[in-house]
Amino acid sequence: MKIAILATNPHLYSHKRLKAEAEAAGHEVKIINPLYCYMNVAASNPKVHYRGGAPLPHFDAVIPRIGASITYYGTAVLRHMETMGMYTLNESIAISRSRDKFRSLQLLARKGIPMPLTSFAQSPDDTEDLIHMVGGAPLVIKLLEGTQGKGVILADSHQSAVSIINAFKEMHANILVQEFIEESRGTDIRCFVIGEKVVAAVKRQAKDGEFRANVHQGGKAVKVKLSPQERAIAVSAAKTMGLRVAGVDLIRSNHGPLVLEINSSPGLEGIEKATNINLAGKIIEYIEKKAKPISSNHRFHG
């Protein structure tokens, strides 16, 4: 098979691992920077050209590893590849859906998937009511555009919540205000979903004095055993987004597991090293089983 990895940085652990496993399985692999791609829009012969002017060849499968900062352009390139009949591991519409944090929460709520109580605002006039909607302090305030734990603040008191929200109000920032689950302070669980199965899971523990468990914020990851309920919720969350491969972040509360976030380009390094599971290899095996050209009547989803 000819496989493209759509990514801006070929040196990241995840991208090197995917390339190595695909090549070890006998496939031809190219890492394609989406920012170097440009496209024509044509009814009969859509094309993607690459830096230097050469048209991209047809790939049997595309693995999108699109960073959050280039979601719009990266998914546009991916969508064009879909119109050309290329199989994409995660489809452009699913990535866009999961990157819109509030939209993803709306979809999860519609499916009855449990999550923390959340409100959404942009420069709210009534800060007090916004706080009241999620049950009061302590609460978590998140910038809608934040990733890897950045732009996430814990307000321990009512006054600090008011001050933080009012500060964001001055920036005209889109924010999520979310109830804080005290019993999960400093921990979360990353479930790695491929297809309709959780293939690996780790518990992430924040460093001392930090409530964000993200490995990028200095947290540590250790292998964890999931309950059947946690597995089912993680798979349902990924399926709701339409993602074939996803990192689903859960927390354990006194009333059961809650979904925090769904990542369409989950990192491999922390979870592979903590579990000794070859996730890159499992992704390539999944592609080998599932990759088929997209039929003409399924090439564009809007």
From Swiss-Prot:
Binding locations of Mn(2+) 2: 261, 263
Chain residues that bind Mg(2+) 2: 261, 263
Positions contributing to ATP binding: 142, 179-180, 188, 212-214
Requisite cofactors: Mg(2+); Mn(2+)
EC number: 6.3.2.-
Underlying gene: rimK
Record-listed Mg(2+) 1 binding positions: 249, 261
PANTHER family attached to this UniProt entry: RIBOSOMAL PROTEIN BS6--L-GLUTAMATE LIGASE, RIBOSOMAL PROTEIN S6 MODIFICATION PROTEIN
Keywords: ATP-binding, Ligase, Magnesium, Manganese, Metal-binding, Nucleotide-binding, Protein biosynthesis
Family, per entry: Belongs to the RimK family.
Superkingdom per UniProt: Bacteria
Domain (ATP-grasp) ranges: 105-288
Positions with a binding annotation for Mn(2+) 1: 249, 261
Cofactor note: Binds 2 magnesium or manganese ions per subunit.
A Gene Ontology molecular function term of the record: metal ion binding
Name under which the protein is recorded: Probable alpha-L-glutamate ligase
Record has Ribosomal protein as a keyword: no
PROSITE patterns for this protein: ATP_GRASP
